């Protein structure tokens, strides 16, 4: 909202879920098992698919998308049982955020959905308010969720994306030389960071 409103000019790590309140169509990026491989996803998001996604779904909301990159596959952790097939999620108290795509996915899997802020996940797992959650592996490790979770299922069910966005009016107000320099710097940075992302 700050970037969109202009009080902040740009931001990094704006995941698709952040846009849902403005345009729910952006949730297409959160479709489970959308791509068959990381290479396939990078080709799509770095090509026409990603360009059209940005142009048709994000930029009309007042943003200029400078890049789209993945921030890791989502995996499921829980305290109840190993997750080996979809039916294993039945009845597990599964934490998700308010994103309608994720809620629909866990509802379809018969999980018992608990909407909870990520900041409350560790405590929720510790005290049994929730049994399970999903995140990228680095997020799970960084939040020490291994201390309060017994099982990890490497499901790769969602490849989470982030964008570097700038307020569209700010970008359009830049001299074309500065626009080109900014575009080039972001593209070069993405090439350098991409091997470290997943």
Predicted regions and their residues:
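N-terminal secretory/targeting leader peptides
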Residues: 1-40, 48-198
